[in-house]
A protein has these predicted regions:
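Tubulin/FtsZ superfamily GTPase core signature
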Residues: 1-109
Length: 109
């Protein structure tokens, strides 16, 4: 993997933070999807590598069903990209969910 990175140069790098601010009756995953669709303004097809971070407070952990929904949603959006995901905690989030996206597009040197 390291050899591949050494022989490539990033053409584009993008970082977005999307935090859930649910409307009345909206689940936090639905809020993330809405926020992404309405405000993220990302041309998903130009990126070939995506890192997803799903961050919650430990008292309101990410449920397996939420994780499955989010991974499926972003996999469909970045359907040509290789992606990885990870989870983390931040107690300041309370009931909210934070999704951090790090997208990159590499080209051979």
């Amino acid at each position: 993997m390291k050899d591949n990175v050494k022989n490539q140069q990033a053409r584009a790098v993008l970082k977005r933070r999307i935090i859930s601010f649910p409307n009345d009756g909206e689940l936090r995953v639905e809020s993330i999807i809405r926020e992404f669709e309405d405000y993220a303004m990302i041309d998903c097809k130009q990126y070939d590598k995506v890192v997803l971070q799903f961050i919650t407070a430990s008292v309101y952990p990410l449920k397996k069903s939420e994780l499955c929904q989010l991974v499926s949603f972003f996999a469909n959006k970045f359907h040509k990209a290789e992606y990885t995901w990870e989870t983390g905690t931040d107690e300041k989030l309370g009931e909210k969910l934070l999704v951090q996206l790090l997208c990159s597009c590499f080209s051979p040197l």
